[in-house]
């Protein structure tokens, strides 16, 4: 590829196929100064990445430079289409459009629109993002497959299956928040399975905690709602309420789990160690001060015999989720 020498080796990108076309014109005059314009076109591009592969890249950009300002997509938006991107996650049908002025201003904004992709057997999209930003751009999750997600992340201590939906309002210039009052909820039945070695380890270290954790070894979740907040330092806060049953123990006894988790998302993304954090939370939360409230082997646990954050109650009816 003739353009390969123009790409830094540090990027780990190796061009594979595709066609590239560009046209440019410029002028310099005493009164008008320097102006330029043109367009770039990439058809069916493909490349090897440092940790993956990209194929089916189509890119069209028209531009104009005048008075130190770039006009992007003067007649039609800058268009990006990618058929497939295989990296940490497999993504298909990626779309994005960009139009406006850079540097942007209130009178000459820059707008990112039509952003979407198919990912994890579901779809992810972003509402129009206008810069300068006044309103949140909403990242919408539709039927994201947890089984596909956990297959990629491979946490050791637990696994989940089923699909979820969600909406995450994104802020780029908020003094505190990147995501505020987002939510993720189940789309149909979910299942949760805790690792046997994890639950056995907790049971051996604390018999009371073991009685409670036994109800979480396997859960069929009928209702799950998680509030999501993320500050601009990367501090992620998840506040969840889960209703389900352990059909392997008693399908008529509901288990309600209230769970709050805090994590630095930037560090978490680097480590992807979800399971270790869950184990730490379980060990800290499912601990009672004494064994006096441990139920007998022949009896079902009551709400008072479970630790704070977990309760057991008749399944019918399960209360409607309260608005956050």
Which functions belong to the PLM regions below?
Residues 1-113, 122-324:
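Membrane-proximal interfacial segments on either side of biological membranes
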């Amino acid at each position: 590829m003739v353009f390969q020498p123009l790409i830094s080796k540090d990027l780990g990108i190796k061009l594979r196929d595709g066609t590239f076309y560009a046209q440019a014109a410029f002028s310099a005059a005493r009164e008008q100064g320097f102006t330029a314009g043109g367009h770039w076109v990439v058809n069916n591009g493909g490349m090897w990445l440092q940790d993956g592969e990209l194929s089916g890249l189509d890119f069209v950009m028209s531009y104009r430079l005048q008075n130190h300002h770039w006009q992007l997509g003067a007649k039609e938006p800058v268009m990006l289409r990618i058929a497939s991107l295989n990296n940490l996650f497999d993504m298909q049908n990626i779309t994005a459009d960009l139009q406006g002025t850079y540097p942007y201003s209130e009178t000459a904004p820059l707008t990112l629109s039509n952003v979407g992709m198919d990912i994890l057997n579901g779809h992810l999209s972003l509402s129009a993002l206008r810069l300068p930003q006044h309103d949140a751009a909403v990242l919408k999750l539709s039927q994201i497959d947890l089984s596909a997600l956990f297959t990629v992340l491979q946490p050791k201590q637990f696994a989940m299956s089923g699909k979820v939906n969600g909406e995450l309002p994104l802020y780029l210039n908020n003094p505190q928040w990147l995501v505020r009052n987002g939510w993720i909820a189940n789309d149909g039945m979910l299942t949760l399975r805790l690792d046997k070695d994890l639950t056995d380890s907790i049971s051996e270290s604390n018999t009371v905690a073991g009685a409670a954790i036994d109800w979480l070894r396997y859960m069929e979740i009928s209702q799950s709602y998680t509030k999501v907040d993320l500050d601009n330092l990367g501090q992620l806060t998840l506040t969840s309420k889960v209703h389900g049953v352990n059909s392997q123990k008693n399908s008529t006894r509901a288990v309600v789990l209230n769970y709050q988790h805090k994590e630095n998302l930037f560090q978490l993304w680097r480590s992807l160690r979800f399971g270790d954090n869950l184990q730490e939370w379980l060990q800290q939360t499912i601990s009672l001060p004494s064994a006096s409230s441990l139920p007998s082997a022949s009896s079902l646990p009551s709400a008072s015999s479970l630790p704070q954050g977990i309760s057991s109650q008749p399944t019918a009816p399960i209360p409607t989720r309260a608005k956050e």
